[in-house]
């Protein structure tokens, strides 16, 4: 997690978000180490309060993720979305769009930070085409 924390600090992120569920392991540590708020993006019905929802397609169907409306995100925040793996980029983009569309955060203020990127599946390119930033530790 040290390298992920360094990247978050270099980006000057002030909020750490994560996509259910393996990303929580890394994101929670980063948020704790840097003393930052931690925002959860979860499957529908898993969060206790009213949520914003974003549906998206996967290679094997469709699904959606939610973030609580009462999250204290402001338009000028710099948000780091932590996930374990980027494949096609669909889940990461859905989370980033959920934040940008509902909290008015600029795409350039959202960094998707992943442990692994599966290069042949094109997720990095699609994320960049949408105007979001991406950093990965390992590219396969």
Describe the function of each predicted region.
Residues 1-82, 86-140:
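PRPP-associated nucleotide enzymes
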């Amino acid at each position: 997690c040290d390298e992920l924390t360094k990247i978050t600090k270099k980006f000057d992120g002030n909020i750490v978000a994560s996509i259910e569920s393996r990303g929580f392991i890394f994101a929670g540590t980063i948020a704790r180490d840097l003393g930052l708020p931690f925002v959860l993006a979860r499957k529908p019905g898993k969060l206790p309060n009213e949520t914003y929802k974003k549906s998206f397609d996967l290679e094997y169907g469709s699904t959606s993720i939610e973030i609580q409306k009462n999250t204290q995100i402001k338009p000028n925040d710099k948000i780091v979305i932590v996930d374990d793996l980027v494949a096609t980029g669909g889940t990461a983009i859905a989370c980033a769009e959920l934040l940008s569309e509902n909290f008015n955060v600029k795409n350039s203020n959202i960094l998707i930070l992943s442990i692994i990127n599966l290069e042949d599946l094109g997720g990095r390119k699609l994320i960049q085409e949408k105007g979001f930033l991406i950093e990965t530790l390992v590219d396969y």
